[in-house]
Curated annotation (Swiss-Prot):
Protein's name in the database: Inulosucrase
Annotated binding of Ca(2+) 1, by residue: N311, D654, I656, S661
Binding site for Ca(2+) 2: D413, Q444, W481, N483, D515
Biased composition (Low complexity): 102-116, 719-754
């Protein structure tokens, strides 16, 4: 979701050096300073040009330091000599003004300046002057020259004294940053007091305060990957001639109540909350999508349906807006949905109140949606909606609230409490993962610029990035407000009327780096949880990175991803930086995509189906070119926490990958006049509206052809050695026939004893 979020673009005209021209010790130097010096040099007299040239030389040296940080003693001596020479020449030239017009001064690099000036003036003297007059003039010139040399000596002495006093009072680097600056090859004697004071503010806290961090270094790597258009991550090219508006998007509009040709963008299927598979509801697949009239603040969610497993884009039907007609003030944005045991849909969505001056007050909400099915007419309709209520608006500590946001710079600061994704863990506990902004636990503000942990690169790289931010007013302003987060809450056991049982610290946060990471999506593959989210790099602080992406590709969108053994914590970035998908074509082409959403492939724990919408909203690709569902494609999840885009593509609007899904005709190429070109006629080289960028440096790329899902023939095992022939067992001897037991003797009948004596015997 982007276009109607009331996110005002920050001015880029404010790019200026905050701390003046950086010295040779600075790692980053704005090119505008050198350009300004060069421009001014064209408008000054020759005697001034020497000083400007010396400054320019030092600025050029700064750029060399920026790329290497290795400075030899010879180069330092040369720079100091240039500065001294320039100062000396200025003094000599000024002293000579008493005898010669400025225009007649000939500036040279040694002490012959005065002599040459004298010679020039002598040559220009009238020819009728007597020799005595000339001699007297020469004496006067010599006296004045001597005075100039004396003045120059005094000035140099005063400069030396001033520099010595300044050195004694110079600020000093302290603690860990002192070692880092030294290790980075920076000459600390060239740092200004302002730079030193700023560097001394840096905090070296070792622990992330709000989950896994998307760092400044990660952001640069993502932009670099986008610019390189690596086929492992670049969104595959689609055949522009095959893309069409969604037939089911012609329906009653929620705001006007009239039949309109609507656009459709952020969409999600009704899924099993534990497996993520698309649910089979009475033989149908159900998808909920944001729809609205083009170029209008019209954002509402609709229910769409098709036979389960049907890949035909034309067969999708529209059950209408879930929350009815006539709701222009209260709108609905992205979310997720799952089935209840009774067949109703439990919907999680973003309720947006626009009544406060269109500031888009976002709240995570839930509702139970009941459906009617008329099988004989192949028709699904919405019966009624119950339990519509707010689940979460932020707690202020882990997640920023609307009231906290209202106290900030609303024009530059993005508000986010949206896009709730439902997932059940292995034990059946239910959670919502959502887009947010960090709260006071790790809040936005200028102090984030001084958190070393936010940078994420080597010490040398971090130092350069720190100075870059301080030297660019727009980057610094963006960094101050950036606090995007992907949050998580645990719900209670009331399935149809859920509330919050526990609020966790964010899974991902980007303080100082980005102010918008949206549409989170968590899927469980095997025993691991994979978290994905969409982002636009121009919501980040690093202007240089996303502007370079715009220049190379004409767009700056991406999908990032992370993996963890636990749902609620411990995520690490995929592909090292978190990059999973990057833009391939300019934002105003028919085949530009966004809002990537990963759906598990049934029977596979190493592949995902990537869905999105195609063609940016507002008819930026041309009149009648509406936002619509894109073809889907496969993403391979590798065991080493890397990913690969596969050359497997579907029709538009395919949410279930099966044997009938693939359609190679939807694949495009980066060739201007090819029948399956990724660009429509006239799109090639067309500038993007927001920056009027042309001449893209697009590169062709080919997704990887996946290995068929069949068992591979195992390697032929070595022939086993023939075992030794076992010994033939001996035939046992016939056992002896046992003796016939003797017949026991028959006992005699005892004599009955009757007398006492007989009994005793």
């Amino acid at each position: 979701m982007l276009e109607n979020k009331n996110h005002k673009k920050m001015s880029l005209s404010g790019k200026s050096l905050l701390m003046g021209t950086l010295s040779t010790a600075a790692i980053v130097l704005s090119a505008s300073t050198v350009n300004a010096a060069t421009t001014n040099a064209d408008n000054v007299t020759k005697n001034q040009t020497v000083a400007v040239s010396a400054t320019t030389t030092n600025n050029e040296t700064n750029n060399q330091v920026s790329s290497s940080s290795e400075k030899t003693a010879d180069s330092k001596t040369e720079k100091d000599t240039n500065l001294t020479s320039a100062a000396t020449k200025e003094v000599k030239a000024d002293a000579a003004k008493t005898t010669s017009p400025v225009n007649n001064v000939k500036t040279v690099a040694d002490t012959t300046t005065t002599t040459k000036e004298t010679t020039d003036n002598t040559e220009k003297s009238p020819v009728n002057f007597s020799a005595d007059v000339k001699k007297n003039d020469a004496v006067k010139q010599d006296e004045k020259a001597a005075t100039a040399v004396k003045a120059n000596t005094e000035v140099k002495a005063n400069e030396t004294s001033t520099k010595s006093a300044s050195k004694d009072n110079k600020a000093e680097l302290k603690g860990q940053i002192k070692d880092i600056v030294k290790e980075s090859g920076v000459d600390t004697s060239k740092l200004t007091d302002d730079q030193i004071n700023e560097l001394n503010k840096i905090s070296f806290s070792k622990e992330a305060k709000s989950g896994t961090q998307l760092t400044y270094s990660d952001f640069k790597k993502i932009a670099k990957t986008l610019i390189e258009q690596d086929a492992r991550y670049a969104v595959p090219f689609f055949n522009a001639s095959k893309i069409k508006n969604m037939p089911a998007a012609k329906t009653l509009d929620a705001q006007t109540g009239k039949v309109e040709d609507l656009e459709i963008w952020d969409s999600w299927p009704v899924q099993d909350a534990k497996t993520g598979y698309v649910s089979n509801w009475n033989g149908y697949q159900l998808v909920i999508g944001m729809m609205g009239v083009p170029n209008t603040n019209d954002n509402h969610i609709y229910l769409l349906y098709n036979k389960y497993g049907d890949n035909n884009f034309n067969n999708w039907k529209n059950a209408g807006p879930i929350f009815g007609l006539g709701t222009p003030v209260i709108q609905q944005w992205s979310g997720s949905a799952t089935l209840n045991k009774d067949g109703s849909i439990q919907l999680y969505y973003t309720k947006v109140d626009t009544s406060d001056n269109n500031t888009n007050h976002q709240k995570i909400a839930s509702a139970t949606v009941y459906l009617n099915l008329e099988k004989n007419q192949d028709k699904i309709s919405i019966a009624h909606v119950d339990n519509d209520h707010i689940v979460f608006e932020g707690d202020g500590y882990h997640y920023q609230t609307y009231n906290q946001w209202k106290k900030t710079n609303k024009g530059a600061d993005n508000i986010a409490m949206r896009d709730a994704h439902v997932i059940d863990d292995k034990d059946g506990n239910r959670y919502l993962v959502f887009e947010a902004s960090t709260g006071t636990e790790n809040y936005q503000g200028a102090d984030q610029i001084y958190q070393w942990l936010n940078y994420g690169g080597t010490n040398k790289d971090n130092l350069g990035d720190f100075l870059q931010i301080l030297s660019n007013s727009d980057i610094k302003d963006r960094a101050k407000w950036s606090n995007a987060a992907i949050g998580i809450i645990k719900l209670n056991n009331d399935t149809k009327n859920p509330g919050v049982e526990k609020v966790y610290t964010p899974l991902i946060s980007a303080p100082m780096v980005s102010d918008e990471i949206e549409r989170p999506d968590v899927v469980r593959l095997g025993n691991k949880y994979y978290l994905f989210a969409a982002t636009r790099l121009n919501r980040g602080s690093n202007d240089d990175a996303w502007m370079a992406a715009n220049k190379a590709v004409g767009d700056n969108v991406a999908m990032i991803g992370y993996v963890s053994d636990n749902l609620t914590h411990g995520y690490v970035p995929l592909n090292e930086s978190g990059v999973v998908l990057t833009a391939s074509v300019p934002a105003n082409w028919r085949t530009a995509t966004y809002s990537y959403y990963a759906v598990p492939v049934e029977g596979r724990d190493d592949q995902l189906l990537i869905t999105s919408y195609i063609t940016n909203r507002g008819e930026v690709a041309g009149k009648g070119m509406h936002a619509t569902w894109a073809p889907s494609f496969l993403l391979q999840i590798n065991p080493d926490n890397t990913t690969t885009v596969l050359a497997k593509m579907t029709n538009q609007g395919d949410w279930i990958w099966d044997d009938s899904s693939e359609n190679a005709d939807m694949m495009g190429v980066l060739e201007k006049d090819a029948p399956n070109s990724a660009a429509l006629p006239g799109e090639w080289g067309k500038p993007v509206d927001w920056d009027l960028i042309g001449g893209y440096n697009l590169k062709p790329h080919q997704p990887v052809t996946p290995i068929p899902n069949v068992p591979t023939t195992p390697e032929k095992p070595e022939n086993p050695t023939t075992p030794n022939t076992p010994d033939t067992p001996h035939t046992p001897t016939t056992p002896n026939t046992p003796d016939t037991p003797r017949t026991p003797e028959v006992p005699t009948t005892p004599v009955k004893k009757t007398t006492q004596s007989e009994l005793r015997s």
